[in-house]
Amino acid sequence: MGVRGRLALLPLALLCLLVLALGLPVLGAPARLICDSRVLERYILEAKEAENVTMGCAEGCSLGENITVPDTKVNFHHWKKSEAGRHAVEVWQGLALLSEAMLRSQALLANSSQLPETLQVHVDKAVSGLRSLTSLLRALGVQKEAVSPPEAASSAAPLRTVAADTLCKLFRIYSNFLRGKLKLYTGEACRRGDR
């Protein structure tokens, strides 16, 4: 191949290098994104704002039915002694249950003309936020870590749940879950650095 042929390939080679160099940091970004405390804090702030808005509505903005949500209480002594896989299961199942609860409340609100539109906006934001958090945790590897061997699954305690019958209680639980179990788990997973 002559000099002209090599020069013709140079722009193509430079383009390939540029695409490769720009693509590599992006591939690793999602796993680290949840490790940036500002990301989780943004979701916590949105949940807290929604909780504050619903505190002001009459009778806590009744949902008209009980919706099952994860219990957000954390026994720190027990949490420190248990394995990361168990934490992953608790967080993954809790997030799935919260997502179902928010989707259910979204459906209930769609059928109600009595509640202000601002409440619908907060529920919609929560649904979107939970989807984003699920994606971020999936990139961190929580879903894989939450899948445990059969012998571990039989000894694992079932997820503790409570019922929420108002939007206020639902958003309080959502906020507490993010500030509690989710923040604890992501902090540990990011410190381990094995992701």
UniProtKB/Swiss-Prot annotation:
GO terms for biological process: erythrocyte differentiation; erythrocyte maturation; erythropoietin-mediated signaling pathway; positive regulation of cell population proliferation; positive regulation of Ras protein signal transduction. Belongs to the EPO/TPO family. Gene3D superfamilies: 1.20.1250.10. InterPro entries: 4_helix_cytokine-like_core, EPO/TPO_CS, EPO_TPO, Erythroptn. GO terms for cellular component: extracellular space. One of its GO terms (molecular function) is hormone activity. Keywords: Disulfide bond, Erythrocyte maturation, Glycoprotein, Hormone, Secreted, Signal. Residues 1-28 form the signal peptide. It comes from Oryctolagus cuniculus. Disulfide bonds join 35-190, 57-61. The keyword Glycoprotein applies. This is Erythropoietin. PANTHER family: ERYTHROPOIETIN. Hormone involved in the regulation of erythrocyte proliferation and differentiation and the maintenance of a physiological level of circulating erythrocyte mass. Binds to EPOR leading to EPOR dimerization and JAK2 activation thereby activating specific downstream effectors, including STAT1 and STAT3. It is found in: Secreted. Glycans are attached at residues 52, 66, 111. The keyword Signal applies.
